[in-house]
Amino acid sequence: MKQNKGDEVNKDFKSKFLSDAEIAKQKLDTVSSSFCLAKWKQLSLHLTTGMNNSCYHPPLHRADADAIKLDPGALHNTEHKKQQRKMMLEGTRPPECSYCWAMEDNGKLSDRHYRSGEPWAMKDFETIKNAPWDQNIVPSYVEVDFNSACNLSCSYCSPQYSSSW
């Protein structure tokens, strides 16, 4: 049977996805126990509402339209995200990331580890960990929602983003 790329299993019978998350946890924790690369490298942009976030779990927030006129990078590098990044670098848990903190407080790996362990995030680990907290970062994982005509019913979604909910 042919395996899909990413489904490889190591000698301990762990998937590559799980192994990458465990490695990510070790690396992230060298910066702080709240550091998450998704806050730097992921952008979920909802054009119908003007809202965005860097993960599926925290609440959406609005980018400053005036800041975007001066610098389109402000669409991702909002003041809100920069403050959350600063907290993470300092070892403070942003309250909006409570989904991950609950998982970790129960001894489990969280999406902080899984998302950060993916190649689109981990490849920039060294650059991000050594950059100033307020530096603008170009996201490598961009998801754009043009309208609510999506016909999927993802568990993390809602009626405002999917016509199937």
Residue ranges and their predicted role:
Residues 53-62, 99, 104, 136-137, ...:
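Canonical Radical SAM [4Fe-4S] cluster-binding loop centered on the CxxxCxxC motif
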